Amino acid sequence: MNGAYRGALSRLLSKPFFLPLLSGLLLGISFPTWPAVHLEPLAWIALVPLLLSLEHEERFGPFFRKSWMSMLLFCLIALWWVCLATFVGGILTVFVQSLFSVVPLVVFYYFKKRAGFRSALLALPFIWTGWEWAYMQQDFSLGWLTFGNSQANLLWMVQYADVTGVWGVSFWLLTFNVLVLLLFMEKESFQVKVGIVMVMLVMIATPLLYARQVFRNTALDNTSPKVRVALVQPDIDPHEKWDGLGPEETLSRLYSLTGQSVRGERLELIIWPETAIPFYIRLPENKPYMDSVRRMVMRWNTPLLTGFPDEVPVFPNSARGEAVAASGAEYAAYNASMLLHPAGGPVQIYRKMRLVPFGERVPYSEYFPWLERLSFSMSGISSWAKGREATVMHFTSRDGQPVRMANIICYESIFPGQVSTFVRRGAQFLTLVTNDGWYGTSYGPWQHAAIDRLRCIENRRAMARCANTGVTLFYDICGRSYAETPWWQQSVLTADVPLESRITFYTAHPDLVPHVCLGIAGVLALVAAVRKR
């Protein structure tokens, strides 16, 4: 029996795509899914089978096919749920993301050919981490599958992100994978094996010790001022919201839920989710609805932050998103949020700056308008224009103190550099509005919520996360959830949010780690170019 088992295993291992697909499987399931599933440690070894299969692959064609098959399976497992919102768009997302994920492995192939496999392994963490950052600087980036995001729910292992950001977590994981492979490959020196094991143990212990100190300091420091915030989860089907409900019924639901939340509470901020108001409420013909919202804010005597589609006039032939005809003028449409004060005054508006590729906007369509034909509309939502300013909103607390906050709209929380910009501009806490109802009961919304933890840790800012159908919750500065609503239920969640003013090392230097990695990778590439193998 044992012989038959070993024979079957040997035949399986001899299949050219078994090890690459095994890596793709391990990578895919290591990313956050539902709350009860914790397979994050698999990411610490997930790349080993793929790299092992590439050791003796000298021709680029087979090398690329193995790498791409691995990344394709990885992306399919981690991102299949995107197809629930738009099937064709989801397939395109998985395909494009897998191609971009292969890029660091193509560079690894160059190093391998010039400097040998072991030298290329040592360069891989620098190559991969630098590429992850570079990839996120352009509009095609989904940014979801940054390697470090796999550890988002493993809070004891990622607290050092306040120093390195998620980039440091990626580098840490990649280095550990390389060490595991080097340990497997070492056949001669017992001392070398012991040395590698010792380094691996240090790499496990260091984040744990750092986290222990962070949690201890957080428990001791309970002096931060707080604001009382209510999160309204209306639980409206997103397709129904855009295609079925009228303005009166939509606002009526929101008013009813919000009215319940203000009874007996000294609230200082009310938050409605992304596009909670699903029509162009600032257009002149919708002024009665805008006046209605203002009256309710005055009645509640509490500032209101809400998502809504905004529109501004644009000049002919200017770069813009979808044009909306109104009173003979031309408008650019934005996915936006606004803050209204009970005392009246100007509305504070933030317009979403990072848009979902192909779902909300076709990348670079402002330069090539014909690309608009490639958009995949979700109930008519597509072709938003890009916001240009990271606006920090402000209001006054009950005790008269000024409060500054960031508002992140949905997918933007995937971009660490953008969130840190809000904090450098003075945001004392983070708010996030989202509508993850497009993805049903898949683990997509939970994956999104998990990644949001990292933004809290990196900047040491609490987050009030308001979702249309869930996941609605509050995170503290360590990424721990301390209040949460049931999923797919109408509800209101109220809690105190701590305000912070300190700036972490990461917030002050958000691009330091990837820049260093790119610099070292560049130097190693020059060395490899002139080195004889």
UniProtKB/Swiss-Prot annotation:
It comes from the Bacteria. Residues 232-499 form the CN hydrolase domain. Pfam families: CN_hydrolase, LNT_N. PROSITE patterns: CN_HYDROLASE. InterPro entries: Apolipo_AcylTrfase (IPR004563), C-N_Hydrolase (IPR003010), C-N_Hydrolase_sf (IPR036526), LNT_N (IPR045378). Its EC number is 2.3.1.269. Belongs to the CN hydrolase family. Apolipoprotein N-acyltransferase subfamily. This is Apolipoprotein N-acyltransferase. It comes from Chlorobaculum tepidum (strain ATCC 49652 / DSM 12025 / NBRC 103806 / TLS) (Chlorobium tepidum).
